[in-house]
Swiss-Prot record:
Keywords: Chaperone, Mitochondrion. Its main location: mitochondrion. Interacts with the flavoprotein subunit within the SDH catalytic dimer. It comes from the Eukaryota. Plays an essential role in the assembly of succinate dehydrogenase (SDH), an enzyme complex (also referred to as respiratory complex II) that is a component of both the tricarboxylic acid (TCA) cycle and the mitochondrial electron transport chain, and which couples the oxidation of succinate to fumarate with the reduction of ubiquinone (coenzyme Q) to ubiquinol. Required for flavinylation (covalent attachment of FAD) of the flavoprotein subunit of the SDH catalytic dimer. Belongs to the SDHAF2 family. One of its GO terms (cellular component) is mitochondrial matrix. This protein may be expected to contain an N-terminal transit peptide but none has been predicted. Transmembrane segments: none annotated. This is Succinate dehydrogenase assembly factor 2, mitochondrial. The keyword Acyltransferase does not apply. It is found in: Mitochondrion matrix.
Length: 137
């Protein structure tokens, strides 16, 4: 009780102004655009996707389940792992190939997320039965 009254007195006496700090990224220009990357910064090389033609179906399912869970961003980890849990076990070999291309061809995970939630239009090459299933979730 004594401690509570002391704390109440301190809180009532100390009226600090509320300050909001706005943090800007170092890559942002004053007009809101992004500064061009300096010449000494090199984008990492991403090896091209190679389709695994003779992979057994059960091995492919296990690999796709793992890849669905271990993405580069939390949103896709949640979205794709939930999708895989619901649909992966019943997919046909053609659907497995479509899903494999969908999660491994685009180099940007945000593209997959934006297509699946309808923020951006899906490119024709990824507008498949599997993408329809993903959008229906």
């Amino acid at each position: 009780m004594y401690l509570r009254s002391i704390m109440r007195g301190v809180i009532e006496r100390v009226q600090l102004p509320f300050v909001i700090h706005i943090r800007k990224l170092s890559s942002e220009m004053p007009d809101g655009g992004l500064y061009p990357a300096p010449d000494h910064i090199v984008e990492p090389w991403i090896p091209p996707y190679e389709e695994r033609k003779n992979e057994p179906v059960e091995i492919k399912r296990a690999r796709l389940l793992y890849q669905s869970r271990k993405r580069g961003m939390l949103e896709n980890c949640l979205l794709l792992s939930t999708f895989a849990k619901k649909f992966l076990h019943s997919m046909t070999p053609l659907q497995l190939d479509q899903y494999d291309r969908l999660i491994n061809l685009p180099s940007n995970d945000w593209d997959i997320y934006n297509w699946s939630v309808g923020v951006k239009p899906t490119p024709e090459e990824f507008e498949t039965e599997v993408m329809d299933m993903l959008k229906s979730m």
